[in-house]
């Protein structure tokens, strides 16, 4: 196993096309990509035929309700705005350190935007699950989508 650090959208597709067996995305990364189709297109390109994509991310419900205490709600489930906010982990630091952590920009997607992007970019959806918030189990907090690269 090798670890490569960098912007996945800048990956060398001549070198890494159909190179990866499984892409595992955990803990909220989709909102860092402003164009989900561009992101899913790259994921498809780097996966081998029949490769698996596992996306475990914050539930889009957190766009309107801060069910995970992320301090990042946008106010509208259907908002397509890109907004500036703290990185999700910043809230775990002292205020002094928290102030020094750079802000980043977000684009939060709806469930249909996520699923449709996977489908448009060559994945079949094998499983989709929603998970309760760890703050209030009556509310959705995360989801897991599992897709297979179509040959």
Predicted regions span which residues?
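A short acidic, Gly/Pro-enriched loop at the edge of an enzyme's catalytic core
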Residues: 9, 13-23
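Generic structural signal for helix capping and beta-alpha/helix-loop junctions
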Residues: 11-13, 63, 135
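Short loop/turn motifs at secondary-structure junctions
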Residues: 19, 49, 122-124
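A short SAM/SAH-binding and catalytic strip from SAM-dependent methyltransferases
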Residues: 21-36
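A short glycine-rich, Lys/Arg-flanked "PGG" loop and its adjoining helix->strand segment in the class I
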Residues: 37-52
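SAM-dependent methyltransferase
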Residues: 53-116
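C-terminal lobe and adjacent flexible extensions of AdoMet/dcAdoMet transferase-like proteins
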Residues: 113, 117-151
